[in-house]
Amino acid sequence: MISVNDFRTGLTIEVDGDIWRVMDFQHVKPGKGAAFVRSKLRNLRTGAIQEKTFRAGEKVNRAQIDTRKMQYLYANGDQHVFMDMETYEQIELPAKQIEHELKFLKENMEVYIMMYQGETIGVELPNTVELKVVETEPGIKGDTASGGSKPAKLETGLVVQVPFFVNEGDTLIINTADGTYVSRA
């Protein structure tokens, strides 16, 4: 059991018979009434996102998640195939279950597959990934003084805001938690 006061981003919990990952949380102490924790949770089985409010001090079960190192191989229609790095066993996950992670996955990338009581429930990405820019407007000399940004389409189809000096063909480091530009690789 874990207190909701100890919530951290990325924590996996069991609520109402489902496994949830804490995406965001906020401790709220209103002037009148009891404190509470407002949280944004993602269902690891279905991918659904739900906002849930807990009373301060309320206890929830912490889900024990096992991870296995696997390699992303390819997409087979709506299914995505991963291979265990030790046993060479292959598993398929539906696109709906790993919708958020698909924006960062490229072939032969090593990831961790999350398992709960023998059931595959999702993909755990590294904190950052390197992706190549396939489409962006060219930077114009003198643009950088304003410190603005422009959209860039990456090899996985993800579109991120990048500084003006980024060009097509550049490899970028992208934060997988929020999909933002970190730096050039």
Curated annotation (Swiss-Prot):
Give the GO molecular function terms. Answer: translation elongation factor activity
Q: What Pfam families does the record tag this protein with?
A: EFP, EFP_N, Elong-fact-P_C
User: What is an annotated GO biological process for this record, any one?
Assistant: peptide biosynthetic process
Principal subcellular localization: cytoplasm
**One GO cellular component from the entry?**
cytoplasm
* Keyword match Zinc: no
Q: Which PROSITE patterns match?
A: EFP (PS01275)
Q: Which InterPro entries match?
A: Elong-fact-P_C, NA-bd_OB-fold, Rib_uL2_dom2, Transl_elong_fac_P/YeiP, Transl_elong_KOW-like, Transl_elong_P/YeiP_cen, Transl_elong_P/YeiP_CS, Transl_elongation_fac_P
> Looking at the keywords, is Protein biosynthesis present?
yes
Task: Provide this UniProt record's keywords sorted from A to Z.
Answer: Cytoplasm, Elongation factor, Protein biosynthesis
List the pathway annotation.
Protein biosynthesis; polypeptide chain elongation
* Cell location: Cytoplasm
Q: What does this protein do?
A: Involved in peptide bond synthesis. Stimulates efficient translation and peptide-bond synthesis on native or reconstituted 70S ribosomes in vitro. Probably functions indirectly by altering the affinity of the ribosome for aminoacyl-tRNA, thus increasing their reactivity as acceptors for peptidyl transferase.
Q: Which family does it belong to?
A: Belongs to the elongation factor P family.
- List the protein's name: Elongation factor P
Species per Swiss-Prot/TrEMBL record = Geobacillus sp. (strain WCH70)
